[in-house]
A protein has these predicted regions:
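The feature marks the mature, well-folded catalytic cores of soluble enzymes
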Residues: 1-97, 135-377
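Intrinsic disorder/low-complexity segments
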Residues: 95-137
Length: 377
């Protein structure tokens, strides 16, 4: 799986329509989308999912008023439950990934037995021309999606990844473990593009909001190696407070280069996030990458608490999105906004750092990274 900073063919988004994600605060949300799309479309194509032609007409009006309508935007008329394509959409890979094309297993990802004698295999759509044993074009991993094992409205979203794969003319792969499809969200992982992946125990190994009851730590690690080309996993502990996904790593720690991560910290010992973030920092300090090298760790302070209706929201500067030539950074009108922006600017000197006010948007429990899905070149 390529790192997010590698060249993109496009960014995928879904236009907001489900007011239940932002109850009482939906009105400003389309305008936040317009700002994001205006920025992205200057740098790369935008694949925009709308529920129907009426929704497309409404979206066009907003985009036009925001000076964001562009020939670089392509509309797709697909019904969705929610807009979080990072999690419901497919995960695009580069043209060839480790594990493909074992001659003795035609048409499937290369199964490799682990210590418990289980195999990880998944069907691959075959090219029709020469009977090749592995896809030569783009690859789309279509994991199952069940709304973070929390919400009941997910069945339309579970179909979106396949529609994206077809529109991108990608070979669709259905990852499996022990003969069952794997449930996995894009926000639960982060990769360096060189063989190392970040995830959390709270999200994947907890019995609460359990995605895959049949899978153990070893099963996940084998799946990451076989399907994502990431044979080395760094496990963090708990995510940030208020995250309804139960521990997504994209609110916590992110790769910014093959050997460097940014991680959220909180110096206030009385804050609910202080202990878990400190524990994760210790794990990172003792972690090694796929080559056995120590990570360079850059700390970013959490934003001062963001609350709405007396509820602590999962505001985090880690939920940025890296696109071609630009980085979209969530800000919350908090004193630590400037520290986060300056840190990201130092880490990405060749990219424009664009702050996106997310104080209203975060009421939906997600920000820039949660709503986007990159399609690599």
């Amino acid at each position: 799986m390529p790192a997010e900073w590698e060249p993109h063919a496009a960014t995928w988004l879904a236009w907001p329509h489900y007011e239940g994600d932002w109850p009482g605060k939906f009105e400003p949300i389309p305008w936040v989308y317009a700002e994001i799309i205006r920025t992205l479309a200057k740098h790369e194509p935008v694949e925009l999912v709308v529920t129907n032609r009426s929704a497309a007409k409404s979206a066009r009006r907003v985009l036009e008023r925001a000076h964001a309508l562009s020939d670089n935007i392509r509309f797709h008329y697909w019904r969705t439950n929610r807009v979080w394509l990072r999690d419901s959409g497919c995960i695009f890979l580069s043209k060839r990934q480790p594990g493909f094309a074992r001659r003795d297993h035609p048409g499937r990802l290369c199964p490799q037995k682990n210590g418990e004698a289980h195999e990880f295999t998944g069907p691959v759509k075959q090219p029709k021309n020469d009977g090749a044993l592995a896809p030569e074009g783009p690859i789309a991993l279509k994991f199952r999606f069940n709304a973070w094992a929390k919400y009941s409205n997910w069945r339309l979203d579970d179909k979106i990844g396949s529609l994206m794969a077809k529109a991108a003319k990608a070979d669709e792969v259905h990852p499996e473990s022990l003969g069952a499809r794997i449930v996995l969200e894009g926000g639960s992982i982060d990769v360096n593009g060189a063989g190392t992946i970040l995830t959390t125990e709270e999200c994947l190994l907890s019995k609460e909001q359990e995605r895959n009851p049949h899978m153990t730590r070893a099963h996940y690690e084998k799946a990451f190696a076989d399907y994502l080309g990431a044979p080395h996993t760094i496990w963090l502990g708990r995510g940030i407070f208020g995250d309804d996904t139960h521990g997504h790593v994209d609110d916590l720690t992110r790769f910014v280069s093959p050997g460097t991560v940014v991680t959220m910290v909180d110096s206030d010992s009385s804050d609910v996030n202080h202990g878990p973030l400190r524990a994760n920092l210790r794990r990172l300090q003792s972690a090694r990458d796929q080559d056995g090298k120590q990570l360079t760790i850059v700390e970013i302070p959490m934003p001062q608490p963001v609350l709405f209706e007396s509820r602590r929201l999962p505001a985090s500067y880690a939920n940025f999105y890296i696109a071609n030539g630009v980085l979209l950074a969530p800000v919350f009108n908090r004193p630590n906004d400037g520290i986060a922006l300056n840190t990201l600017a130092e880490l990405f000197p060749t990219r424009e750092i664009v702050p996106i006010y997310s104080g209203d948007f975060i009421w939906g429990f997600g920000a820039m990274h949660c709503m986007t899905q990159q399609q690599p070149e």
